[in-house]
């Protein structure tokens, strides 16, 4: 948005318009709410409390009050959570706001189904670790209250993943933009993560070999593939 505005000398103004698809797409699926699981240090190396301490130190060193994470893979890494809200991606549709005093995870999409004990257990574990779980749809109101009430005067966001709807409600005076430190940090794998990657590659290799064997034998036998 800023690049476009600067390129045309500020002559283009973006506005938040109603979602016109809602009128046409009457059977539009609801936001997914798949089971949420948590991972322990034996699976990821760093416990979430350690990651929160790390990001808070980063905020202190930079002189910022808070960071808003909008990239789903970064949120999954920060909280050691996994889901299936996006097909073939182990992520949860959510936003994460970390301040020096609070960790707000906007992930709840309504009541947890009675048969989803996994998510309920995961939420209890997160709450015990100081993660305040909010409704997914409450993120805009929460950000507005924090910024308008001067509770946050230096909010760090990554413009590469921040959507326009959230950008439009943030006071630009209080927003610092840059590359997310979480994406950079999670790219440096610890020993546990490296071991997990090796195991995953082995399993993936076995699956690929089985597929190639099936493909070759099927073609040689004249079967339809």
Identify what each model region corresponds to:
Residues 1-225:
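Active-site neighborhoods and metal-handling regions in enzymes and metal-associated proteins
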